[in-house]
Amino acid sequence: MSIKSGSIVELMDLGPEPIDPRYAAYFTPGTRHTVLFFDPVTGEIELSYPGLVVSRPGDGVTFFPGEYKLIVE
């Protein structure tokens, strides 16, 4: 399976960088989210947050490999 826009991922342990307090309660380990953008070079994904308008890469909340696992392609 490979990740793409629309895939469902489950968040795991978050990396060493602190997450913005506005998003910390929403993006907790074990929660599932829909991928908006995926960078095949870095494995970076972007997710949306309620009230956050995401229309292009760079607008979303970023997570890196090891911080998420693919649930549904």
Features from the language model and the residues they span:
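Intrinsically disordered, low-complexity repeat segments enriched in small/polar residues
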Residues: 6-7, 11, 34-37, 65
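Short beta-strand-centered aromatic/proline hotspots
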Residues: 21-38
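Intrinsically disordered, low-complexity, charged/polar segments
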Residues: 46-73
